[in-house]
Amino acid sequence: LLHGAQGGRNKMKQTKSFEIDMCNGTLANKILLFALPLLPGNSTLTVQQPGESESYIRMTIEAIAASGIEVQESNAFSWRIPGHQQYKSYSCHLNGDYSQAAVLCCAGALGHDITVTHLSPVTTQGDRAILRHLMALGATVEESDNHIRVKADKLHGATLDMHDCPDIAPILALTAQLAEGESRLTHCGRPVSYTHLTLP
């Protein structure tokens, strides 16, 4: 439970456990992952059925770890988060966003021969799947030195699994509609899932 600021700081009160409906996304998980290290005690966060949001949770953990925060993965989708931690400032290079770049990549697949820069091939971003899906539709994808070039070819229908990358489903649906033949996008929804938080 989070209480209002007192003397410039937030006072957090511990509770045994609670559940959060995750059917509308992972925002609550992200907030908890950022807040729990500041508690006076240790916490355990468990996500049931992360489904189509797994990569977004892992990106959050990667970001707070870079700030000096320790997060211990006890088993699949369960993390122990020690308390009394402090965030530390650091310098870093921000990689390009595959979710936003997906629009440009799809434009390239539809006939505009587009090159998108500053997209790292080594990333936890699930939306990097846009490259795999465009190739499945028949587009030509070339990668070199953090540059991605997408060229049009004769697009055809395909079955595209949106597991772990639902944010790019809308732009892929539009692209597939302009391809020849039938396409099917699976696992586009966010199933009802719950987050369990335990504070000893």
Describe the function of each predicted region:
Residues L1-L197:
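Short, structured segments at the rim of ligand-binding sites
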